Amino acid sequence: MPVSKREQSKDTGDPCALPKLPIPPLKQTLDMYLTCMGHLVPEDQFRKTKAVVEKFGAPGGVGETLQKKLLERSEQKANWVYDYWLEDMYLNNRLALPVNSSPVMVFHKQNFKGQSDVLRFAANLISGVLEYKALIDGRALPVEHARGQLAGTPLCMDQYNKVFTSYRLPGTKTDTLVAQKSTVMPEPEHIIVACKNQFFVLDVMVNFRRLNEKDLYTQLERIRKMADIEEERQPPIGLLTSDGRTQWAEARNILIKDSTNRDSLDMIERCLCLVCLDEETATELNDSNRALLMLHGGGTDKNGGNRWYDKPMQFVIGADGCCGVVCEHSPFEGIVLVQCSEYLLRYMRGSPSKLVRAASMSELPAPRRLRWKCSPDIQTFLSASADRLQKLVKNLDMNVHKFTGYGKEFIKRQKMSPDAYVQVALQFTFYRCHGRLVPTYESASIRRFQEGRVDNIRSSTPEALAFVKAMASGSKITDAEKMELLWTAIKAQTNYTILAITGMAIDNHLLGLREIAKELKLEKPELFSDTTYATSIHFTLSTSQVPTTEEMFCCYGPVVPNGYGACYNPQTDHILFCVSSFRECAETSSDLFVKTLEGCLKEMQDLCRKCNTEVKPADSTQRMEGNPKVMKNGSKS
């Protein structure tokens, strides 16, 4: 969903100047949980769930005890859910980062005519990265303000501080998000360049002076030549970072027994970012294939080993013009990736000739190749990591589709929220493909609050179900009635969005109640061992709106084996959809979903045209505004 517009502001961006994330009333969350799940599970199961929820929320019950403890936690913490959420969403997850966790930004295809063009692009990009880091360090980034629903509120800028200073350290049971800020160690002043599965240290500060683009180009040229020296070739250790987190942690524990490996790991873990110079792939570089290459590198026979997935920002520059960014998601949200990427593309467009004008340093120290000592155990881990990456590559099914029937301008003319409209369209599509609705995740920014990240907008509402059923073929419902149901579904979606962005949704609250019960070493409350709760957090449809102003798009993989990832980028006259699924699942098909989505969007447009030819602004505004903070169950935010 759209969360930010950038404005010059007197605000400092200091998280402490923002309000704390509120804790919703217990009864409100429990009522809303039942409303969200009643139509998604069998009746018998729901009856049992209702009894479990009533017991949990009863006066003097366990729910009240946990709520009281959460309120106490809120007094002591800047953000009561942040640690719980970070561990649950990312650090405890044992799946491999590529496809399963790390989103990517795919740039417009570049037309490089040779290696010098590639290195010039890379030098220009690195120069932009250093400019952007200087803005972050100098607290000179304009404070962002919310747009869309409840526009104008200043947003927490804390996530930007983690872009170049954090690292996701693998652990056998849980990972650690490491902040590099240290009073003892000097600030990192190097970038790691990956080339032909080798890793090189590129110092960006020499003799207290930042390298200009000519210097960077010279160093990148040296790195390219060093990577070609066969007898110096090191094993593709980057493959280990593409594996499951426990496997990578076990391999790393073996690696660090050797001092050479420790030094190499230290240089990577403390770098600003990675720049991955990829080889040509001999692949047709349409949008879908570029998305796949960005998500997993194409596997071991392409550029799958030319990565280090633990680092938040990896800038990929392919010799064939396939370029973009791979993002380790735990330190920050997609909007930060968008803003950084858009800054870099604007910077590069505005400074194409610096390389020619700049004078180079006469004496530049040679870039350093990172070396590895590989025991037989590490060779075994490498082989297993390569096999698992290949399996992931073969399994991922991606369809990037530009829907050109209309864009957000048409939707706005109907006096509807484009995001709510697209969410209802995705529900319509899933229902038409699978004959049911499922728990759906749409990320909602809670950056209005100190250290705010996201909560979940549950888009599979009862109102959406009523609409999609009415649109089923053979329905005797009139167009006017269908239109009324569409309005109701969009209003319900809009209302839930407002609840989520104001800290009143249910997912973070339920997570907090669950985790504080663990901390208190209480027996797991029945609410969280109930089948309906397991269903509620199995997000078969994982969605996110990631709008861009530059020519690029974001995509990611499904979050469950039988699910879809659906990222969308609404523009004035078209909407770009990136739909992913797994080939191993017989139920899902990205191509079928996209084809069905196209039809559903056209049907919704036809319905709007039939019924909204004379949209009365006053009527439609009243319809959308109504009481936007009141849910169907009467709970208020």
UniProtKB/Swiss-Prot annotation:
Q: Which family does it belong to?
A: Belongs to the carnitine/choline acetyltransferase family.
Q: Name one Pfam family in it.
A: Carn_acyltransf
Q: What class of enzyme is it?
A: transferase
> Where, by residue number, is the active site?
H329
Natural source organism: Danio rerio (Zebrafish)
Compositional bias of kind Basic and acidic residues:
1-13
Query: Carries keyword Transferase?
Result: yes
* Protein keywords: Acyltransferase, Neurotransmitter biosynthesis, Transferase
Q: What is this protein called?
A: Choline O-acetyltransferase
| BP GO annotations | acetylcholine biosynthetic process; locomotory behavior; neuromuscular synaptic transmission
Q: Positions of the region Disordered?
A: 1-20
Q: What does this protein do?
A: Catalyzes the reversible synthesis of acetylcholine (ACh) from acetyl CoA and choline at cholinergic synapses.
Query: Could you tell me which InterPro entries the record lists for this protein?
Result: Carn_acyl_trans (IPR000542), CAT-like_dom_sf (IPR023213), Cho/carn_acyl_trans (IPR039551), Cho/carn_acyl_trans_2 (IPR042231)
GO CC list: cytoplasm; neuron projection; synapse
Catalytic reaction equation(s): choline + acetyl-CoA = acetylcholine + CoA
- Annotated positions binding CoA: 407-419, 445, 545
One GO MF term, please? Answer: choline O-acetyltransferase activity
The organism sits in which domain of life? Eukaryota
- Enzyme Commission (EC) number: 2.3.1.6
Q: Does the keyword Acyltransferase apply?
A: yes
